[in-house]
From Swiss-Prot:
This is Imidazole glycerol phosphate synthase subunit HisH. It comes from Xylella fastidiosa (strain Temecula1 / ATCC 700964). Its main location: cytoplasm. Heterodimer of HisH and HisF. Pathway: Amino-acid biosynthesis; L-histidine biosynthesis; L-histidine from 5-phospho-alpha-D-ribose 1-diphosphate: step 5/9.
């Protein structure tokens, strides 16, 4: 069985991500320090809360440098995806810088609520193993106030008062702005695709 490291980033979604993986036949290893990453074939970075708090927690756990050196597939979920980028407007905080781009606050408008909360459509942009067998018009469940504008690494977008990156992949570095663990069959398929993607 593939060794999956699930980083305890302090978010409320940790248990639901673990349960989603268990439904796929995977018992993840909860990780609180660098030693926990040893031998992992896949790494998952979930996150709920604020970017400054999450980066401080990763620093306190001694996980920033190990994540920067990581060679195996990594996926960030929700805030975890935002942390993969260079900088977040939330608290004006530097992030991991594993992917080029900056996290911006969503702009509210009369018909656009922030936070963006609920089901919304995934709009594929280019081929990616993460999207294998995900049907056209699939929806995912979002809860966020910040997002990454479209980048060259984006493989799917979402429209909420403007387009933003919903799924990102650059080599083995991946992210989902939505919550796959709360996105029914679509989310389960994307998690399975991540677990099964080529590690090279």
């Amino acid at each position: 069985m593939t060794e999956v490291a699930l980083i305890d980033a302090g978010g409320a979604n940790l248990g639901s991500v673990r349960y989603a993986l268990q439904r796929l036949g995977v018992e993840p290893r909860l990780v609180c320090d660098a030693r926990g990453l040893e031998g992992a074939a896949r790494v998952i970075l979930p996150g709920v809360g604020s970017a400054p708090e999450a980066m401080a927690r990763l620093n306190n756990q001694g996980l920033i440098e190990p994540l920067l050196r990581l060679q195996v597939p990594l996926i960030g979920i929700c805030l975890g995806m935002q942390l993969l980028f260079e900088h977040s407007e939330e608290g004006d905080v530097p992030c991991l810088g594993l992917l080029p781009g900056r996290v911006r606050r969503l702009t509210p408008a009369p018909s656009i609520r922030v936070p963006h909360m609920g089901w919304n459509r995934l709009l594929p942009l280019r081929a990616s193993p993460l999207l294998a067998e995900v049907p056209e018009g699939a929806n995912a469940y979002f809860v966020h106030s910040y997002a990454v504008p479209l980048t060259t690494a984006a493989v799917a977008a979402c429209d909420h008062g403007g387009m933003f990156t919903a799924i990102v992949q650059q080599g083995v570095r991946c992210g989902a702005q939505f919550h796959p663990e709360r996105s029914a069959e679509t989310g389960a398929r994307i998690l399975r695709n991540f677990l099964e993607m080529d590690a090279a």
